[in-house]
Curated annotation (Swiss-Prot):
<dbReference type="GO" id="GO:0043952">
    <property type="term" value="P:protein transport by the Sec complex"/>
</dbReference>
<keyword id="KW-0547">Nucleotide-binding</keyword>
<dbReference type="InterPro" id="IPR036266">
    <property type="entry name" value="SecA_Wing/Scaffold_sf"/>
</dbReference>
<protein>
    <recommendedName>
        <fullName>Protein translocase subunit SecA</fullName>
        <ecNumber>7.4.2.8</ecNumber>
    </recommendedName>
</protein>
<dbReference type="InterPro" id="IPR036670">
    <property type="entry name" value="SecA_X-link_sf"/>
</dbReference>
<dbReference type="Pfam" id="PF21090">
    <property type="entry name" value="P-loop_SecA"/>
</dbReference>
<dbReference type="InterPro" id="IPR014001">
    <property type="entry name" value="Helicase_ATP-bd"/>
</dbReference>
<feature type="binding site">
    <location>
        <position position="491"/>
    </location>
    <ligand>
        <name>ATP</name>
    </ligand>
</feature>
<keyword id="KW-0997">Cell inner membrane</keyword>
<dbReference type="GO" id="GO:0006605">
    <property type="term" value="P:protein targeting"/>
</dbReference>
<keyword id="KW-0067">ATP-binding</keyword>
<keyword id="KW-0653">Protein transport</keyword>
<feature type="binding site">
    <location>
        <position position="83"/>
    </location>
    <ligand>
        <name>ATP</name>
    </ligand>
</feature>
<dbReference type="GO" id="GO:0031676">
    <property type="term" value="C:plasma membrane-derived thylakoid membrane"/>
</dbReference>
<dbReference type="GO" id="GO:0005829">
    <property type="term" value="C:cytosol"/>
</dbReference>
<dbReference type="Pfam" id="PF07517">
    <property type="entry name" value="SecA_DEAD"/>
</dbReference>
<keyword id="KW-0793">Thylakoid</keyword>
C-alpha cells in the first residue's frame, strides 16, 4: 500500500539519475565524429578541468560518453542505457544489482575511468586471479586506448611488480591480494618495500560474495611456531575411540563440539593425565580439534587430499584454496586424521577482515546479480545503498516449483532421470552441487544411464578445463555438473561460444611454437586451457613436471576447419615465429598476444593483425554451426538449471538460477531437495522430522506440500539471520581491533616515513621517566616519604649512563621539577649515547632507532593479537554473569592496548640505551637493517 502511495523507492532513486543518462545520449553524436586522437585527447582535457576546480560529477556526462564511444571502437561493445545507469550508481558509491549477462564487467569501465582522472588510483576488485586478468586485458583496452595506465596484480608477482601495478591509474586485483598487500605493507621495514598507495576508490565485482560470504573469514598473515606433532597424533587416536552422543555432543549449527563428563573421564584415562586443562601439559585444545576434524570437517566436502597435502575447498565457490590453512591447530588435526605429514602450526602476525579492509576506502561501489535480499546488511555495516538496475531485455526464465523427496537417494535418482530426459530433448542442463563428493555421486549415476556429461569441481584435473567446460555448457544436449557456480566468470551461451572456440584453436597452433620451453614446465602447473586469457589463478597443480600441449579436447570444436582457413592460421603463426623468434616468449606474454588478436582494439602491429585475420576466419566458420545450434536450443526451451540443495542463503540459490535465461533467452530452473539435506536437518528441526514420518511415500516419489515449502523458506531465513548475526558479531568485535590496528599502523607508518626519529625516541624516554616518577611518588604523602632511592634505581636500570644520579639531588624538588630535571638528564644521556654509537659508524644511531621501534611494534603487536584472541574466547562466558561480553571486550581490550603502547615505549628506550655495537658486527648488522 505504502509503495503505491509513495512510489517504489528504487524507481525514485533511478529517476533521479535519468537526466544524466539523457545528457550522455545527447552527447553521443558529437563524440562519435571525433578522430581516435581527439578522443584520446579528452583525457588530458578532463584532467585540466579537474585541476581548475571542476568536480568529478560535472565531468560525468561527457566522460561517460567518451568511455561509451571508446568501448564501441575498441571492443565493439556500446554501453546500453541501463549500463550507464549502473555506472552512475557505482560512481556515487552505491551497489548496483544487475542480472547475470547484463554486462557488469563493461559497466565498471565508466566509474573507474572517471575516478582515475584524479590520479589517485582506482582498484577494480574481482573474486579470482583469472577474472582480474581477463578484465584487465579485455576492459583494460578501453582505458589504455584513452591514455590511462592499467595495472594487474596476480598472486605470483614480486613486490617490485606489485608496486609498478598499484601505481597505475586503474589496477585490477582480487580481494585477497589487496588485503594481503595491505597487511604486508604494514609489516614492511622500509618505505621502499611498501607497494600500495593510499586507498581512493574501488569497484567490487560480485560485491555480495566478497562483503558478505567472505566477511566471516579474516585475512591472516602468519609465522611458524613449533608444536609437538605427537600430541596431534595421539589426540586423533583418542577422537577415533570416543563415541558421539556418549562421550561428546556435536553442535552442527555452531560448528562446535562439547565433551560430556564421561568423555572427559575417558579422554583423561586414555591419555593417562588427571586434567585435560592442566596449563603445564594442556591437552583439551588438541582433543577438541581432533573431534572437530572427525565430525565437522569431511573429506571431499570441506577439503581434498592432494599429493599428501590437505587442501581447503572454498564452501562458497567450490574451488580449492592452495596455500590457505585453517588456524588454531585445526589443519594439523585434520592432517593427523588423514595420516598425512603434520605441518608446523602458525602464529598470527597481522590480520584484518574484509569488512574493515573495504571500509578503509573513502568511496566504494559494487556490482552483483543478487544484493537486494541482503540490503539491510549492506546499509548497516557498510553504509551502502542498493539500487536495482532494470534488465536491457525482458526476462524469459521460468522458475519451477521445488521437488522434495523423502531420502537423499530418492532425490539423486530423480535428478539423474531429469538430466536424461533433458538430454533426450537436446536441452542443455547445468546441475549445481554443493560438494566434490556429491558431484561425483551424480556423475556415477549418469555414467550408469550412459549420459555423456562434464564434471567441474575442485579436483585439479577438472579445474584446468574450467572455462572450456562452462563455455560449452550451452551446447545442444550438454550436461554439466558444477560445484557452486557462484562467480564463475565465463558466460553460458546457448549453442556454444564461437569466439571462445576460435581463440582455443588459435592457441593450439600459436602457443607450442612461441612459448619458451623452460617457461611451460617450470611450474609443474598446467594452466587451464584457453580461459579467455588462459590464466586460472594457479588453481590446478599437476604432480611432477609435465610438458604442455595446449591441445583442447577435439569434441569442443563443432566442425573441421577448411583447408584455406587452416593454411591462413599456419601462415599467421609462421609470421609470428619469424618476428618473435622460435619458442622465445614467456607464457603470459604469449597469452597476451592471443588475447589482443582475439579482440577488436585498433592496433598497428602487423603480426597481430595477421593473427587477428586468421582468428576471425576461424570464428566465422564455427559461427555457422553455433548460430544454427543457438536457434535450435532456444526453440526447445533454452538452458535448464538444476539446484540439488538449498544453500545457506537464498542469494546463492538465485545466483545459480541466474545462469538460465540470460539476455532475454528462454530457460527454466528447478531445485531438487530431500528431507535429509543439511539445511533442513540442521535448521528445519523436529517439525520436518515429524512431517517425514507423516508422509508414507516411496523414496523416489516427490512430495509437494505448502507446509513443507514454508518450512523450507523458514529454515533458509533462519540460516540467513543466524549467519548475519555471526557476521555482525565478527564486525562488532573486529571494530575494536580495527581502531587499534589503525592506530598502530599509523604510528608504524610515521616511523617508516620519518627521516629523523630522534625526537620521537626522546619523547618515549621522557614519557618513560614520567611513568617511573608517577609510580614511585605518591603525591598524597609528604615529600620526605617519597621513595626516591627506588625511583633513582629504576631510572638507572633504563639509562645506565645516568649512573652518577643520586637521590639527594631530587630531595627539594616538586614532582613537576623532578620530571623536568629527568627530562633534561635523559636528553643529555641520549646525546652521549648517540656520540658513542656514531663513532662506530656515522649515522648508525638513526638506523638503530628505526630498527628498534619497528621491531618492538611488530613483536608486541603480535603478542597483543594473541592476547586479544584469548580475551575474546574468555569474555564469551561472562554473558552468564549478566555482563555484556562486547562491552567487557571493548574495555579490557582498550586496557591491553594501552599497556602495549607503554611497553613499546619502554622497550625501545631500554634497547637503545643498552645497544652496544661491535665495529665488525656492526657493518653486518647495519646491512641487515637497511
Amino acid at each position: 500500500m505504502l509503495k503505491l502511495l509513495l512510489g517504489d523507492p528504487n524507481a525514485r532513486k533511478l529517476k533521479k539519475y535519468q537526466p544524466s543518462v539523457t545528457e550522455i545520449n545527447l552527447l553521443e553524436e558529437e563524440i562519435k565524429v571525433l578522430s581516435d586522437e581527439e578522443l584520446k585527447g579528452k583525457t588530458a582535457e578532463f584532467k585540466q578541468r579537474l585541476a581548475k576546480g571542476e568536480a568529478l560529477d560535472d565531468l560525468l556526462p561527457e566522460a561517460y560518453a567518451v568511455v561509451r564511444e571508446a568501448g564501441r571502437r575498441v571492443l565493439g561493445l556500446r554501453h546500453f542505457d541501463v549500463q550507464l545507469l549502473g555506472g552512475i550508481i557505482l560512481h556515487v558509491g552505491q551497489i548496483a544489482e544487475m542480472k547475470t549477462g547484463e554486462g557488469k564487467t563493461l559497466v565498471a569501465t565508466l566509474p573507474s575511468y572517471l575516478n582515475a582522472l584524479t590520479g589517485k588510483g582506482v582498484h577494480v576488485i574481482t573474486v579470482n586471479d583469472y577474472l582480474a586478468r581477463r578484465d584487465a586485458e579485455w576492459m583494460g583496452q578501453v582505458h589504455r586506448f584513452l591514455g590511462l595506465s592499467v595495472g594487474l596484480i596476480q598472486s605470483s608477482m614480486t613486490p617490485s611488480e606489485r608496486q609498478k601495478n598499484y601505481d597505475c591509474d586503474i589496477t585490477y586485483v582480487t580481494n585477497s591480494e589487496v588485503g594481503f598487500d595491505y597487511l604486508r605493507d604494514n609489516m614492511a621495514t622500509s618505505m621502499a618495500d611498501v607497494v600500495q598507495r593510499p586507498f581512493n576508490y574501488c569497484v567490487i565485482d560480485e560485491v555480495d560474495s566478497i562483503l558478505i560470504d567472505e566477511a566471516r573469514t579474516p585475512l591472516i598473515i602468519s609465522g611458524q611456531v613449533e608444536r609437538p606433532t605427537e600430541k596431534y597424533l595421539q589426540a586423533a587416536e583418542i577422537a577415533f575411540t570416543l563415541k558421539k552422543d556418549e562421550h561428546y555432543d556435536v553442535d552442527e549449527k555452531a560448528r562446535n563440539v562439547l565433551l560430556t563428563d564421561e568423555g572427559f573421564a575417558e579422554a583423561e584415562n586414555l591419555l593417562g593425565v588427571t586434567d585435560l586443562f592442566d596449563p603445564e601439559d594442556p591437552w583439551a585444545h588438541f582433543v577438541f580439534n581432533a573431534i572437530k576434524a572427525k565430525e565437522l570437517f569431511l573429506k571431499d566436502v570441506n577439503y581434498i587430499v592432494r599429493n599428501g597435502e590437505v587442501v581447503i575447498v572454498d564452501e562458497f565457490t567450490g574451488r580449492v584454496l592452495p596455500g590457505r590453512r585453517w588456524s588454531d591447530g585445526l589443519h594439523q588435526a585434520i592432517e593427523a586424521k588423514e595420516h598425512e605429514e603434520i605441518q608446523p602450526e602458525t602464529q598470527t602476525l597481522a590480520t584484518i577482515t574484509y569488512q574493515n579492509l573495504f571500509l578503509l576506502y573513502p568511496k566504494l561501489g559494487g556490482m552483483t546479480g543478487t544484493a537486494k535480499t541482503e540490503e539491510p546488511e549492506f546499509e548497516k555495516i557498510y553504509k551502502l545503498e542498493v539500487a536495482v538496475i532494470p534488465t536491457n531485455r525482458d526476462r524469459r526464465r521460468e522458475d519451477l516449483s521445488d521437488m522434495v523427496f523423502k531420502t537423499e537417494a530418492g532425490k539423486w535418482g530423480a535428478i539423474a532421470r531429469e538430466c536424461a530426459e533433458m538430454h533426450e530433448l537436446g536441452r542443455p542442463v547445468l546441475v549445481g552441487t554443493t560438494s566434490v563428493e556429491k558431484s561425483e555421486l551424480l556423475s556415477r549415476l549418469l555414467k550408469q544411464l550412459e549420459i555423456p556429461h562434464e564434471l567441474l569441481n575442485a579436483r585439479p584435473e577438472n579445474v584446468e578445463r574450467e572455462a572450456e567446460i562452462v563455455a560449452q555448457a550451452g551446447r545442444k544436449g550438454a550436461v554439466t555438473i558444477a560445484t557452486n557456480m557462484a562467480g564463475r566468470g565465463t558466460d553460458i551461451i546457448l549453442g556454444g561460444n564461437s569466439e571462445y572456440m576460435a581463440r582455443l584453436k588459435l592457441r593450439e597452433y600459436f602457443m607450442p611454437r612461441i612459448v619458451m620451453p623452460e617457461d611451460e614446465d617450470s611450474f609443474g602447473v598446467q594452466r587451464p586451457a584457453g580461459l579467455p586469457t588462459g590464466h586460472g589463478g594457479g588453481q590446478g597443480f599437476v604432480p611432477g613436471k609435465k610438458v604442455k600441449t595446449w591441445r583442447a579436447s577435439p569434441e569442443i570444436f563443432p566442425t573441421q576447419l577448411t583447408k584455406e582457413t587452416e593454411k591462413l592460421l599456419k601462415d599467421a603463426v609462421e609470421i609470428a615465429v619469424r618476428e618473435y623468434g622460435d619458442r622465445s616468449l614467456p607464457e603470459l606474454e604469449a597469452e597476451d598476444k592471443v588475447a589482443v588478436a582475439a579482440e577488436k582494439a585498433p592496433i598497428d602491429d602487423p603480426v597481430i593483425l595477421k593473427l587477428r585475420e586468421a582468428y576471425n576466419r576461424v570464428k566465422q566458420e564455427y559461427e555457422q554451426f553455433t548460430t544454427r545450434e543457438h536457434d535450435e536450443v532456444v526453440g526447445i526451451g533454452g538452458l535448464h538449471v538444476i539446484g540439488t540443495e538449498r544453500h545457506e542463503s537464498r542469494r546463492i540459490d538465485n545466483q545459480l538460477r541466474g545462469r538460465a535465461g540470460r539476455q532475454g533467452d528462454p530457460g527454466t530452473t528447478r531445485f531438487f531437495l530431500s528431507l535429509e539435506d543439511n539445511l533442513l536437518r540442521i535448521f528445519g528441526g523436529d517439525r520436518v522430522a515429524g512431517l517425514m514420518n507423516a508422509f508414507q511415500v516411496e523414496e523416489d516419489m516427490p512430495i509437494e506440500s505448502g507446509m513443507l515449502t514454508r518450512s523450507l523458506e523458514g529454515a533458509q531465513k533462519k540460516v540467513e539471520t543466524y549467519y548475519y548475526d555471526i557476521r555482525k558479531q565478527v564486525f562488532e568485535y573486529d571494530e575494536v581491533m580495527n581502531n587499534q590496528r589503525r592506530a598502530i599502523y599509523a604510528e608504524r607508518r610515521r616511523v617508516l616515513e620519518g627521516q629523523d626519529l630522534k625526537e620521537q625516541v626522546i619523547k618515549y624516554a621522557e614519557k618513560t621517566m614520567d611513568d617511573i616518577v608517577d609510580y614511585y611518588i605518591n603525591i598524597d604523602l609528604p615529600s620526605e616519604e617519597w621513595e626516591l632511592e627506588k625511583l633513582v634505581e629504576k631510572v638507572k636500570e633504563f639509562v645506565y649512563l645516568l649512573a652518577d644520579l643520586q637521590p639527594n639531588q631530587l630531595e627539594d624538588m616538586t614532582v613537576g621539577e623532578i620530571k623536568a630535571f629527568l627530562h633534561e638528564q635523559v636528553r643529555i644521556a641520549y646525546d652521549l649515547k648517540e656520540a658513542q654509537i656514531d663513532q662506530v659508524q656515522p649515522g648508525l644511531m638513526r638506523q638503530a632507532e628505526r630498527f628498534f621501534i619497528l621491531q618492538r611494534i611488530d613483536t608486541l603487536w603480535r603478542e597483543h593479537l594473541q592476547q586479544m584472541d584469548a580475551l575474546r574466547e574468555s569474555v564469551g562466558l561472562r554473558g552468564y554473569g549478566q555482563k555484556d561480553p562486547l562491552i567487557e571486550y571493548k574495555s579490557e581490550g582498550y586496557e591491553l592496548f594501552l599497556d602495549m603502547m607503554v611497553n613499546i615505549r619502554r622497550d625501545v628506550v631500554y634497547s637503545l640505551f643498552m645497544f652496544q655495537p661491535q665495529p665488525q658486527q656492526m657493518m653486518q648488522a647495519s646491512s641487515e637493517m637497511v
